[in-house]
Amino acid sequence: VTIVERAPQPHPNRRSLLRGAALGVGALAAGAAVGPLSAARAGASPTALSGKTAVVVGSGFGGAVAALRLGQAGVRTTVLERGRRWPVNPDGTTFCTINEPDGRSAWFADHPPINQLTRLQSIARYPGLIDRVYGNGIDAIYGVGVGGGSLAFGAFTPQPRRKDFATVFPAQIDYDELDRTYYPRAKKMLGTSPLPADLLANPAYRGARAWLDYIEDFGGEPVLHDFCVDWDVVREELAGRTPASYSIGEGPYGSNSGAKNSVDRNYLPAAEATGNVTILPLHEVIEIREISGQDRFEVVVKRIDESGAVREHKTLVADYVFMAAGSYYTSALLATAKAKGTLTRLNDHVGKGYGNNGDFLIARGLLRRDCGAKQGGPGVAVMYDDDNPDGPISMSWEASPFPDIAGGSNMANLIQVISDERGSIDYNPATGRAELNYPFGESSSDVDARGRSFAGRFHERTETRFGSPATGIPIYTRLSDFGSGCTWHGLGGMVMGRACSHEGQVDGYSNLFVVDGALLPGSSAMVNPALTITAVAERCMDRFVAARS
């Protein structure tokens, strides 16, 4: 075991800095977003935290925010990421595709993690992009690599409505403050914007136009929202000047064109540019323990190679630890630490309150409208139905690269509800590992029941009512990875106001924090959670720095 003293060196990368500037990720007023170029200057300013050390576990949305803000505060910070870096190659071969997966698709697995048409295919074991956690009652999808979930998410960054937010989040999280400060900051840093009108009019985006027509058929109103996409790159795709990705429905396995504004293209380069942050890929945290008599931690890590072989064990000592390994892994590490007695002050809420964000995925086939097979995406708008008999509901369209043989009459939609159903991440002494438990079967789940009901209602109002009852019949069986059997948006496990404070400080510790989706209360209020995770992490880091300045 090696005791590692962190002495991060600056990693200014001219190309990434110039790209950040070109994206307009510049400095705003005090407390607002700071882009890569100005971040290097901000990181040089001494604060009361200067010279302190921190470990950030994970490099997704929350971890990237923590890394940047710690670096700017002068904290010598090490970011531990179990996955590899994924630099986008100009030849378009960085990532595999949905219909032709290989080892790059999955985190050391024998089969691809998503897409039922390829799930039985054999692949080489490799530190690939997606880790599918097989739970008891639900599976959960997590992105792995420098950039975490931002590498694999669908690039949806909607902001929840105020009334839905108030239903889910505790009153201590002020929506007005998020709306005024932290949502705009997150949007600026991530480079989010709605689907532009010229792309919506493009033939490749007929699926998006069909979705807007279906919303009108239903009697709803489309709510256009932001996506974490560089639309100029998508225009280059359509012009044939860069490899096609979002223009043909790709994205979950990464964007070969570089159109996805994942955090390895904004927050993380800015963090490295402060000179205080070092990112260590292929470093997996296996244990966190308090140091007796000290207000510090030891973080035990194994460094692996791309075959999965362990090359080295390390123990890092830090003044502060920020957990951002994804809701399952953050919760699993802490639940394990509690069970093994390496973190003795954790409370009984650790691992509890895990929700699937109210997600209910459906496919609609043989539609009466042409949607295209390789659908330009990633989306366009969300529809709300506040008059739904089973309670308010939202529904979005997710562009997909359906096989050409399937024709252009298919559509994937995500229905979202607000539900109290919660599972847990629990340490199992029989296996020596944490596991995901979600005791809501397909026949007993509130999310499934409401999702099925609305899917039928939507079909009646958009197909049957127009004289076409045999078209657009929804598919939602869990056996096909639809319904609520597998979530991309697992949230909770270290819930604010229970296992943690509303600022992310873990109960029982003054120097241990959670800044990822584990902190959210099992839901992000009927929208995809990436933007809210980022905004809440920004709020947490502002509070952290201010309290120690």
Regions found by a protein language model. Name each.
Residues P281-D295:
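A conserved short coil-to-beta-strand element within the FAD-binding core of flavoproteins
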Residues A171-E284, H459-T462, Y476-T487:
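Conserved redox-cofactor binding core of oxidoreductases
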Residues V1-N13:
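N-terminal secretory signal peptides
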Residues Q72, G83-T97, I288, I304-K374, ...:
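Glycine-rich loop(s) and the adjacent beta-strand/alpha-helix scaffold that form part
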Residues G522-C540:
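A conserved FAD-binding loop/helix module that cradles the flavin
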Residues S45-T167, I173, Y329, L343-L366, ...:
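N-terminal glycine-rich phosphate/pyrophosphate-binding loop and immediately adjacent elements
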Residues I123-Y142, G149, F153, Q172, ...:
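FAD cofactor-binding and catalytic pocket of flavoenzymes
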Residues P12-A33:
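N-terminal export leaders
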